[in-house]
Regions:
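Class I SAM-dependent methyltransferase SAM/SAH-binding core
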Residues: 59-99, 104
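A short SAM/SAH-binding and catalytic strip from SAM-dependent methyltransferases
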Residues: 117-129
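Short, glycine-/aromatic-enriched active-site segment of Class I SAM-dependent methyltransferases
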Residues: 156-173
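Short alpha-helix
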Residues: 174-192
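A short, conserved alpha-helix within the catalytic core of class I
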Residues: 127-137
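Conserved beta-strand signature within the Rossmann-like core of class I S-adenosyl-L-methionine
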Residues: 142-151
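Conserved class I S-adenosyl-L-methionine
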Residues: 1-46, 50-58
Length: 217
């Protein structure tokens, strides 16, 4: 999970070593099913010439695929500086480094420029204030917001509780959260976005919303 309670916990958990592991996995297997869904959801509404902003983008795999698909530029805002070196190397390898910008900081509190598309993949699950995070996303998104989250059910809440207990015993500040999906979606809809596609199965659920509100399928 690429998310956390605060910068210190994030940097501790998502280290340079973790970034290298993710790069190796991407090089050998490509995008995960959930990440591929995110890319496809963005492409469904058109990516050619668009700008993309991804808080918590990690090694930038989703951004790389969107840039390859025709996006004009992308920006990744990442809490952990440990991802930068590996991510920049991967972007150079993919031939998109000149079109990808990376910043270190809290997306919900920085001055990042707006973009056509905002992606929050595996991020809201561990940000304590989902209203603040998604509120920042809709302020920045001109056209589309896509986000993924773990299902809020007995099994997932028990699992996240066990993970948080383990982290607490280790003295880690990293935490995960199972925010209510309906309330998260309402934050985005309140800003004038309407859902157009869902990801309903798997560990990561997802929803994509657009300002034009052409309807959910």
């Amino acid at each position: 999970m690429k998310c956390c309670q605060g910068p210190s916990g994030y940097g501790e958990f998502f280290s340079e070593e973790q970034a290298r592991r993710e790069v190796r996995r991407y090089r050998s297997k490509g995008l995960s099913k959930a990440s591929r869904w995110v890319v496809d959801a963005v492409r469904e509404r058109g990516v050619e010439g668009r700008t993309v902003l991804e808080p918590g983008g990690g090694i930038g795999a989703v951004e790389i695929e969107l840039l390859k698909a025709g996006a004009a530029r992308s920006t990744v805002v990442e809490l952990s500086p440990g991802y930068d070196e590996a991510a920049r190397e991967l972007a150079r390898e993919a031939g998109v480094a000149e079109r990808m910008e990376r910043r270190v900081g809290d997306f919900a509190g920085n001055g990042t420029e707006p973009a056509d598309v905002v992606v929050l993949h595996r991020v809201v699950c561990c940000y304590p204030d989902y209203e603040r995070l998604l509120g920042a996303a809709v302020e920045k998104a001109r056209q589309t917001v896509v986000f993924t989250y773990p299902p809020r059910n007995v099994v997932s809440r028990a699992l996240l509780g066990a993970v948080n207990l383990w982290l607490r015993l280790r003295g880690s500040e990293f935490r995960t959260f199972a925010h209510p999906p309906e309330r998260m979606v309402e934050v985005v809809r309140h800003a004038g976005f309407e859902p157009y596609t869902h990801r309903r199965g798997g560990i990561w659920r997802g929803i994509a919303l657009a300002r034009d509100g052409r309807g959910l399928r």
